[in-house]
Amino acid sequence: MLKSNNIIPSRICEIGCGAGEILNCLANEYGDDVVFSGYDISPQAFEICRKKEKQNLHFFLKDLLDEEAISFDVVMAIDVFEHVEDYFGFLRKLKKKGTYKIFHIPLDLSVLTVLRSTPILKGRQSFGHIHYFTKETALATLKDTGYEVVDYFYTRAFLKLPRYRGWKINLMKLSRSLCFSLHHDLAVRILGRFSLLVLAT
């Protein structure tokens, strides 16, 4: 997404970096021309990610939002603000931390999930999602908190599911792929299990 929008960063940060694998992959891809910083408030996550530190990759057991006078070219929040109780306040504070922001937002609301309700409850219990979005409400949330959306596209997590998980799951996986190839928005709105990657300023 950065390359397609001709953005050449020198400092990239991830808030809520977890095990740090996203930053680790990016650090390997970009090399020493870019410095990467990961922030997380979980001691358990920090113990995992600190082992991946290298010359251009550093991790901090801190809340980025509490850090004064620090900013980056790009700040990433990958599957983060759906976990935050005051996500409007979180987004407003985060805006000051970087020139560009990249968000990855699970789109938990679809016709299928609303009709069944179980997937939403499972996401709440298993993943800690306490806010649920469609594409429209996700983009509106960013605009309401002062962001300007530069670019976005869907990502399809269901494609990573292994084939041996059962015929029902494989059938739904095929249905989502076929519907998505015909009409992106309709497939996302009806069948779900998509996320949104957003570039904003």
Language-model features: locations:
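Conserved alpha-helix/loop element of class I SAM-dependent methyltransferases that forms part
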Residues: 1-8
